[in-house]
Amino acid sequence: MAVLSRLIQAPAVVRVGAGASTELPAILADHRISGSGTFAVAISEGSGISLREQLSRSLPADVGWFTVPRASLDDAVDLADRIRSAEAPYDTLVAVGGGKVIDAAKYAAARLGMPLVAVATNLAHDGLCSPVATLANDAGSGSYGVPSPIGIVIDLDLVRQAPPRFVRAGIGEILSNLCALADWELSHRETGEQVDGLAAAMGRAAAESVLRHPGGIGDESFLAVLADALILSGQSMAVAGTSRPSSGACHEINHAIDQLFPKQAQQHGEQCGVGALFATHLRGDLLLAAEMAEVLTRHELPVTPSDLGLGIDQFVDAVTYAPQTRPGRYTILEHLDLSRSEIHDAVKGYVATYAR
């Protein structure tokens, strides 16, 4: 018998808008989210304190508050252990903060077998809805498969309180989908890797909505579009069962920068934006590259290695090393298989084209 449908993991509740966090009590009262109405809240050690003061006024007094020092595997395991050993029997975990808190909480919730509600306070990357937790470990960092959040809340009032850089980074992150999708399609042609058409359509729609939007981070309409795009991008990974719709040569270059030059590493989305633009230029899609460069420039995002604080030779090192960060993944970098001297020439040409 033909398959009539397929099951797709997706959030039960999504709220995006100014003041959306005020709906959190009602969301947590939903029995699909929390059966008993007892929940723990994970926050960062820094800005999380002020967020606790803002949110605690509308939440029950018996909420358990837990701080997360950083997004490391050890801290995520420790968070799960502290919640498990708490006197109150919590049945839901709420993560309030940026990607680091949410990633640690996603991993902790998976260990505990709890649903997670993600309350994002910035728009730096698409991890808020993805089935992946990126955590620091002894080898540098690792990506861990976890269930996607059961609820997503993005309060644009809280987003506006974040440093602008943490919003702009999400623009670079979402534009990198266009590079990732081109790499996925390239792999399909060259290696026979299957492309999930629905996931690809979702990832492309997310990127195009930001690429074509004339507004900026000061516009509520643009923030709403960016928030929706990041949710859609994260969901595309859940549909595909892989990070392929959002991760290609762009993310390989990003991971290489993180590993080779950790003290110079910038925001994830900033590095992915530059990596995506370079890979698109390398692919020869110069029309799309010009569009991406214009959008990155308009939103005051990095475009060249020097904008990231890297010299040409350092960026060449990162591009040369990039394929080693994701063994088995086929992108334009693996396809061209350039020598270091060829990469050096390509980077010099890229800088000459896009330097401001």
Where do the PLM segments sit?
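ATP/NTP phosphate-donor binding region
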Residues: 1-92
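C-terminal charged capping/lid subdomain of soluble metabolic enzymes
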Residues: 3, 7-8, 174, 285-356
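A glycine/threonine-rich phosphate-anchoring loop and its flanking beta-alpha core
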Residues: 11-12, 110-206
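A short, small-residue-rich loop immediately preceding and capping a beta-strand
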Residues: 86-108, 112-121
